[in-house]
Amino acid sequence: MLNRISVDPRVCVGKPTIRSLRITVDFVLKLLGDGYTADEIVQEYPELEKEDVYQAAKYGAWLASETTSGIV
């Protein structure tokens, strides 16, 4: 369950955020992609918890698993 991911059009232009903290899921995913560990992210951004980072990764995996179709 992704109960820490929020989508609100009034926060970060509707981008998915972590608990409406104005830290976007894509930002956390970029940090992970750059090699940061969950511990390092939480240390740099103390308002986050490790579970926030894990749920951001799960959300990214869920989006990547969605089937898309090309425009015909």
Sequence positions of predicted segments:
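Short, Lys/Arg-enriched N-terminal segment that forms or immediately precedes the first helix
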Residues: 2-17
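Amphipathic, hydrophobic secondary-structure cores in small proteins
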Residues: 24-54
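C-terminal structural segments of small proteins and small subunits
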Residues: 42-43, 47-72
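A broad, low-specificity signal for short, low-complexity segments enriched in glycine/proline
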Residues: 1-2, 66
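Small-side-chain structural scaffolding
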Residues: 12, 16, 33-36, 56-64
